[in-house]
Swiss-Prot record:
Region named RU B: 115-251
MF GO annotations: cyanuric acid amidohydrolase activity; metal ion binding
Stretches for region RU C: 257-370
EC number: 3.5.2.15
Lineage summary: Bacteria, Pseudomonadati, Pseudomonadota, Alphaproteobacteria, Hyphomicrobiales
Pathway(s) of this molecule: Xenobiotic degradation; atrazine degradation; biuret from cyanurate: step 1/1
Entry protein name: Cyanuric acid amidohydrolase
Region (RU A): 1-106
Length: 370
């Protein structure tokens, strides 16, 4: 098995088109552009169907990296996995997290335990009528397994976060399916985001053995007892396939980072966030074990679909001015930021089948100096 070293760099941005921080790190030699495998980002759009800050950010990054790699911007987008999550409500701060990977001859002497590893895979392009249905679940499950192999992770227990970028429906895509005599899961562009996120998350659950493979189309957005504890899915208009990024710990990794996770049972589950921090030797800011430093936190958030949090009614689902996903990102983002001591954390809205209903997974990456 090959040995790899993974790097993780959190870079603040002044806007969705800001690449100055990344270019500065490349210029200083801190980041080798040829080693960049994935970029996860938070952009200050609305996180909805018409949030073009995600596409803008990807275009800016691809244009900036193209001459560094000797590729066209289109080729850069095929080479690197870009996952932009729109919506930095409340105290959430726009930023990108750059993951690099390079092969090394062996693990350094004295390096103990499993360390952070990353793997990537893509599904095929989906037909509009396949989104939110069994085909998307099955293809995603296969891609998760491929990404695990790419990361050198064999045991599902070592997988702590699976980030997926998935497609959504537009009126043109719905019409294309109809012209072929097929119906889509929904005709609502906004509603399709939930279907696509949910089916993708169930694909993760199937791949990791968190649920059986006998999931039907009717289970998506209905059987909320079926979920993955590590899936994080974000829908966007800019693609028609799923991009799958697996983050976990591997004995084949020589990185100076470690990842752990917990599952929030609801939007105010501070204990779960604290548990995730403790998994990697961290505590509520500024507490940490010697030789441990927080790099970033990744979490999912959603308004509880039953309309209540711990028995008290919430109004996030009834607000016609602000979507429930924006409410949830702001609430969970504030909670995590308070515990982490920073608003530059990755909190994504819409957690269908990603953790229990109303909750969601939370993962923490720490840098180890030992």
């Amino acid at each position: 098995m090959r040995t790899t070293s993974v790097g993780v760099f959190k870079i603040v941005t002044k806007g969705p088109g800001d690449v100055s921080g990344l270019m500065a790190m490349i210029g200083s030699g801190a980041i080798d552009p040829k080693s960049i495998l994935a970029v996860l980002g938070k952009t200050e759009g609305n996180g909805g169907v018409n949030d073009f800050t995600r596409e803008y950010a990807v275009a800016a990054l691809c244009t900036a990296l193209a001459p560094q790699l000797g590729l066209s911007p289109e080729e850069v987008e095929q080479r690197i996995a870009f996952v932009m999550s729109g919506g930095t409500e409340g105290v959430l701060s726009p930023h990108i997290t750059v993951f690099t990977r390079r092969e090394v001859e062996r693990r350094p002497a004295g390096l103990s335990g499993k360390r952070l590893s990353i793997g990537m895979a893509h599904t095929r392009d989906f037909l509009p009528e396949e989104l939110g249905r069994a085909a998307q679940i099955a293809e995603t499950a296969a891609a998760v397994k491929a990404a695990m192999a790419d990361a050198g992770i064999a045991d599902p227990a070592d997988v702590h976060f699976v980030q997926i970028k998935c497609p959504l429906l537009t009126s043109d895509r719905v019409e294309a399916a109809s012209a072929r005599g097929n119906k889509t899961a929904t005709t609502s562009a906004y509603g399709s985001m939930a279907y696509s996120r949910g089916a993708s998350a169930l694909g993760v659950a199937v791949a990791l053995g968190e649920t059986g493979s006998d999931i039907s189309d009717g289970d998506v957005l209905r059987r909320y007892d079926l979920f993955s504890k590590v899936a994080s899915t974000s829908a966007g208009i800019e693609l028609m396939h799923n991009v799958v990024i697996v983050l976990g710990n591997s004995a084949a990794s020589a990185s100076e980072f470690e990842i752990g996770h917990a599952v929030m049972n609801d939007a105010i589950d501070a204990a779960a966030v604290t548990s995730a921090l403790k998994c990697v030797g961290l505590g509520v800011a500024p507490q940490a074990e010697a030789g441990r430093e927080l790099v970033n936190i990744f979490a999912k958030a959603e308004a509880s679909p039953d309309g209540s949090v711990r028995g008290f009614r919430h109004t996030m689902l009834e607000d016609t001015d602000i979507s429930s996903t924006r409410h949830a990102r702001a609430a969970v983002g504030g909670l995590i930021a308070g515990l982490a001591g920073t608003g530059a954390v990755y909190v994504s809205g819409g957690a269908e089948h990603q953790g229990p209903a109303g909750g969601g997974p939370v993962a923490v990456i720490a840098r180890l100096s030992d």
